[in-house]
Amino acid sequence: MILKSFLLGNLLSLCMKIINSVVVVGLYYGFLTTFSIGPSYLFLLRARVMEEGTEKEVSATTGFITGQFMMFISIYYAPLHLALGRPHTITVLVLPYLLFHFFWNNHKHFFDYGSTTRNSMRNLSIQCVFLNNLSFQLFNHFILPSSTLARLVNIYMFRCNNKMLFVTSSFVGWLIGHILFMKWVGLVLFWIRQNHSIRSNVLIRSNKYLVSELRNSMARIFSILLFITCVYYLGRIPSPIVTKKLKETSETEEGEETEEEGDVKIETTSETKGTEQEQKGSTEEGPSLCSEEKEDPDKIDETEEIRVNGKEKTKDELDFRFQETWYNHSTVYDNDISDSYGDQEDWELEILKLKDKQLFWFEKPLVTLLFDYLRWNRPLRYINNNDRFPNAVRNEMSQYFFDTSKRDGNKIISFTYPPSLSIFNEMIQKKIFLSTTEKLSPEGLYNHYNYWIYANEQKKYNLNNEFINRIEALDKGSLVLDVLEQKNRLCNDENEQECLPKMYDPFLNGPYRGRIKKYYLHSIRNDSITSTGDSVETVWINRIHDILPTYREFGHKMNIFDGESLSTDIDDSLISIGELAEESASSLKLLALLAEQRGIDSENKMRYLSFPFDRVTTDPNNQTIRNEAIGLEEIGKRVPRWLYRLTEDLEEQEDEDLEESTEDHGIRSRKAKRVIIFADNDNNTNTNTHTSTENTINSDQGEELTLLRYSQKSDFRRNLIKGSMRAQRRKTVTWEMFQINVHSPLFLDRIDKTFSFSFDISRMMNLIFRNRIGKDPEFQTSDSEKARVKEEDKKEEHKKKEDERITIAELFDTIIFAQAIRGSMLVIQSILRKYIILPSLIIAKNIGRMLLFQFPEWYEDWKAWSKEMHVKCTYNGVQLSETEFPKDWLTDGIQIKILFPFCLKPWRRSKLGSHHIDRMKKKEKKDNFCFLTIWGMEAELPFGSPRKRPSFFKPIWKEFQQKITKVKKKRFLFLRVFKKRTKGFLKISKEKTRWVIKIVLFIKKKMKELTKETLIVLFGLRKVYEPNENRKDSIISDKITPESSLRVGSMDWTNYSLTEKKMKDLADRTTPIRDQIERITKDKKDNFITPNINISPNERSCGDKRPELQKHIWKVFKKGSARLIPKWNYFMKSFIQRIYIDIFLYAINMPRVNAQLFLELRIRKKMIDKYIYNDETNQEGIDETNQNTIHFISTIKSLSNITNISHSNISNNNSQIYCDLSSLSQAYVFYILSQTQVLNKYYLKSLFQHDGEYPFIKDKIKDYFLTRGIFHSESRYKQLPNCRMNEWKNWLRGHYQYNLSHTRWSRLVPRKWRNGVNQHHRIKQHHRIKKKNSKKWDSYEKDQLIHYEKDNSYAVDSLPSPKKKMEKHYKYDLLSHKYINYGYRKDSYIYGSPLQINGDREIPYNYNTHKSEPFYVPGDIAISDYLGEEYIIGTDKNPDRKYLDWRIIHFCLRNNKNINIETWGNMNTEIDANKNTKIGTNDYQIINKKGIFYLTTHQEINPRNQKKNLFDWMGMNQEILYRPRSNLKSWFFPEFMRLYEAYKTKPWIIPTQLLIFHFDGNQKKDLHISYNQKEHLELETQNQEEKKRQDKKNPGSDAQNQKDVEEDSTRSDSKKRSKKKKPKSKSNKEAELDFFLKRYFLFQLRWDDPLNQKRINNIKVYCLLLRLMDPKEIALASIQRGEMCLAAMKIQKDLAVTELIKKGILILEPVRLSIKWDGQFIMYQTIGISLVHKSKHKTNRRCREKRYVDENYFDISIEQHGKMLVNRDKKNYDLLVPENILSLRRRRELRILIRFNSENRNIVNRNPVFLNGNGSHNCEQFVDRDKHLDTDTNKFIKWKLFIWPNYRLEDLACMNRYWFDTNNGSHFSMSRIYMYPRFRIS
């Protein structure tokens, strides 16, 4: 046992326990806080450095430690925390103290009394040292925040349980760290004092006076250091005094804007949550509500008085938000309160109590003025909500706001408490009288808890009773319409059923509440107008006023605050309308009414609309007098908004005729400089301005065309507000002098690094071995690869140069005066170049030519010089003029562009060849412009590197070299000929000399012979004989001396001639052999070291003297080396290759471990694909090879159930998509349900099929369920196997809202969707399906009790349609039932279509039998509802796909009456089944007179009578005719989108010829429509339908209401860019362009990408050409060098669409497929189990019913709802979920009350219903428990499991949002509701 305790695991666990203990962690954090050294350490070091004595050191240390101890204590002691945490109290203490401190240090003897007592504690200076250290330790974290490590303590506090132990240990840790730090400082000081080398420094010794002075002024130095550090710390927070105040918008402007935008009032509150702000860590913004709009910034708490019926009242009276202005009670206010209290005797006592409670009231104005964190400085960020709202919404500090709240009657900490509510509660607490704020006793708390339970139970009981009563009414055979809970309407006359208009009805909310414009109120504020008594609007206003409660009654409720909600009081008072309607109208006061919540903000925040009504009194003369308008105040939580409407610079510029505003723009936009590129002095409109609207902005005068020049670096201003302090940038690294983008170190791997951080093994190996293995075919790269690498290198080089240019440009832009210096230098260089340098060079050149006796070229040079133009350009290079400088060029910068730059040439008359001339011409054409640099050089681009100028002397040198070469060539030829001739001459001369010598010798011989003969003859007897012994031994030589020849000849003359001939021949042979041997020897010496062989003509063999062995060895060596030398290269190659492969394999194998999971995933994916598509290999639409792999996400565990979806097998884009988060989450929930094993106990089945009698489940309902196939009673005992993927896949296949194609899914970004809905308002076109000859149904449709028709105003259209909600309810109910009832029947309809058994039942799907589509689309639902604009969000990437490229097809608009592209109906390909079927279509015909599009009426199309198209390819035209159509009515060419959608669905069925079949080139379209036409077009259909509906449904409405609707729609559609009204004189072209860009430029119609740049380049050239008298030459030159593009110029005025497309100006292209891989795609894959190929869709033909289109305009949701409740066979109930009887709000309330289970007081088991059987009473209201039957309580668990999916996740989100204020939908756990129970699977 002892050994076990010493095991490593136990030892480690023990160490971990010790390390994680509170004490150790506290010590650690305390030790860390030592290093947050702030200004407080300066005093501590000062006492030690100045050597003021031990007393001062001790007092400094004591004060320092005491201050820190107080800081630690303040964490728990609330009063101390409040005292130290209030910024104004700290400031009030610090500022005088700092002043005193500076006086103290500057006047050393200010407090010196001349004598000190012995008791050092009484010494004032020592006490001041103590106070200094104590106080600055306290100030350190608040007025001088050091946020480095101080927050760590507070962070860990929330984690540990024993908090006091943690604080104590952290203080001890801080103390230890502080002692160590002080010891270290003491050691350093001691070392400095003891170090002799420092003290004996010559400089110090020579400056003893300086040292003493330094010692004396040490205090001042410390005060300066303290001041510097204080300023540094103050730099991190906004200064409370030195801030830029915002100028407030004027009252009238603000009022107009407010009322136009929906009267969003903004409330004020003072600094009351300073402590909370510090506690919660909000360093940027206050959390609470915003200030009132019409208040002066410097007088926050002054209440603006409003005159109401002759009485003065403050806003506090009308505004129940209780501004903190109670210190300023006016007598009027007191009187009003006393009136409201009536004759209360204790009124004065209450006022005294209330005033006693307001302590320090005199301090409030100053404190609020300085420290109101809502007002005293500008906000850090300003969120602009697309100009829909008057002021921007303020960010709350956090969604995690901690406060106490009551849940289950107990006080607990809420982590998501609304901060505004917390502030409001705190303000309320200050206003409630002392008697009500007494703490309750435990008995009181218990009673309160019981009361809470009782109230909840009472609510639940009432709801349950109502629910049961409604169900019983159904059982008795009542009509469904009578049983369903209906909307309450405010009626005026019960008999005539005359209700208020929807906009005025307080009971309606959501889309029915339009916005009422109040701008007319300001014009009549002080007037009273008379109108006739039959004015309907006035009547309605009067009626509303008449039913309101009196002010006295309501005011009493307001001031008592008995704990009940005020909104409840209002509701109660509205319910008692009948009682109050009889009261006198004159005594009514107007209060807060009609505060209806409405979610129109895109960020899930709620704002409340308040509607003003005028009090109208009727006088006897039948005329009504309208009093002044009173804006109603309201009760409710507001979205906090910034007080001011701040505008950007660009926003202001977009208003053309805006007056000159003196105030600055509030928001910093991206740093841009406006450069005027054209000023039209003649007020002529520039015809080309509309082409460059994206890049140009008209100035205020409308005469100047300006370009914006943006800085080429990161936008560090990022919509910051001027005057606001921005937080210091942290987590950013800059390692370059001018870094364009500042990144966090987290993203270093994603940025282009200047030096490589990565160690690339393969790249290094390539660099090392590239030369050695490059020739090996295995390692050789292809030519395309080489070209690609070369292209990449070229791009990198280009990018590098571009970055260098940007860096230089930014350098000049950032350095002060750099632009002025550079501009001046450029102008000087331009003048020098043009008028001094170039002329002097021309003169020097021509003088030099004359000196060299050549003709001068004065004329040519001066002509080229005069052609050179120095054009002044903007900083971006936009050419202006030769003489005109850009505006503010000294500050904004300038470029000088040289057109036709002069190049000095040594001669102009080129005598070169034609090819050289052509080359020169090309070069000249390319380089005929440049930019001047500050050094006088030429650059191709602004700030580019200087290019090489053609040298003047280079051609001269070339010519000189050519001439030298020619001379050399001639000399070489001469020498060659001369040598040849001399050689021949020498040879001849040699032969001649030999001949002469021979002759001479012959003569000599003859002469000798003659002399000899003469001598013999003379002497007679004497004869001389010569000796010949030496003849045989003589050496053969070429020389024949006369002596030897004479000797030989003397022997025998005939013998001599033969011998001489042989000798001569031998000599002639030997000479060339000897020469050849010498040459070979010389050549071999270069390659091999050969022995020096002396070859002479005397030796007959060269190798005779070499030993045989040596010769043999040398021969072998020579042969071996000769073989080895060619093989050596291959040997080295193979060796290096082997090394390379080994290293490479190792480098590859390294990530193999990490890749295994991915590979397994891939294998599983292949298995899944094989599993799913095993029967579909031969089917169309699936490209197996192109399937994308699932990106590895480790959170998905059940990989085998995830189907991989590729681009190719998702071919359906017309499936229904619900783009709200709830349906996605619900789909995911169903997927999770499908993954879990189903229980073997099916209690719901037994619940339904039980024989007992229950009040809810009747036999009639059971029979109805049985006939519908919901369950089979005979199959109740069958066991349900586990749900496999196939079953759920087959069932979900029928639910088209889950068949989300990848194209659709990739666009379902919820935020984008929400924004898109609000931005792209659509005119919905609905058609409804009507049952023949059903009078009841017609009456039901006309009944106004179920109001699901949608108001077509744009303000309303952004809300989700009720039809979708009804469809969702229906789908969820079906799925729930099928999930529960699955497996009890053989042909369970999960496998097939829903409810196959009842053939005549109509369901909202469309079924096809013969050739079904890949996915179901509902036949009776407008496809526009799920193929609208909001789903089509353009993306940038266009992956390869097998779809048609639309750019090669030129469409043309057509009006063919026989077959229109527009007449594609729903996906009914089997038209033959119902010959008389009338397909519901919405046709879109393009009519030239009206503009772009015009909506026709619904056409009834009989496909049998349709004319066949001329080109019918295998019957596909008929299929194309009935393709699904998209509702792109507000787009440019809607039929193209439909074609594309159809083509994408089945790309193989639409022949290309048909797409381009009808060409009508003569039909031309104007691409622009006027602004007024746009409004007219958009409202035309809507107004007609609105009028119909108003006339039918609301007989009380009149033309004025309709006018309001129209104006609303118009107003909401046009953007409001400014605070001021837009002028009506806006040019038509600008309006057209705005409309065009806003509507159609986004997705479908786009310019050619290079076209934008071409147009910008054209504009740059136009700017120059417009200023020239004769622009022809410059224009031609610009076209030649490609600066001006003629194709981009619209020369023809009227161009057909086909022409525009042919020219490449317009490109029609589809919305591109997205390739985003994110979490949403993973969710999509979970739903992807529903995707099955079309061949598996087998449905019942009987399910299709005959329907026809009705002309009337009704919302489709009526049928949807009706089909769920009313059936063809007259059964009046089809309630899959009984709670659908109730309205949505009551349903939600019932669910929440049931889920809370308030009777269970055990906090741990929140939902005991799921955990034990005791909670089954929650279901008792649905089912009467039969006491005789032994019913298992677990049956009700199954009932809960069935009901809960119908609770729907959006309901849960609503519960979170409104009950628990959780804004984020992912924080479901905050609600403490367990969604799904854990079951034990038996």
Curated annotation (Swiss-Prot):
Ranges annotated as biased composition (Acidic residues): 251-262, 293-304
InterPro entries: TIC214
Biased composition (Basic residues): 1616-1626
Cysteines engaged in disulfide bonds, as pairs: none
UniProt membrane topology term: Multi-pass membrane protein
Transmembrane segments: 18-38, 64-84, 87-107, 124-144, 172-192, 221-241
Single GO cellular component term: chloroplast inner membrane
Localization annotation: Plastid, Chloroplast inner membrane
Biased composition (Basic and acidic residues): 263-283, 1578-1615
Keyword Plastid attached: yes
Domain of life assignment: Eukaryota
Pfam families the record matches: Ycf1 (PF05758)
GO BP terms, alphabetized: protein transport
Keywords: Chloroplast, Membrane, Plastid, Plastid inner membrane, Protein transport, Transmembrane, Transmembrane helix, Transport
Region (Disordered): 246-308, 779-800, 1578-1626
Role played: Involved in protein precursor import into chloroplasts. May be part of an intermediate translocation complex acting as a protein-conducting channel at the inner envelope.
Homology family: Belongs to the TIC214 family.
SUBUNIT field: Part of the Tic complex.
Protein's name in the database: Protein TIC 214
Organism (species): Illicium oligandrum
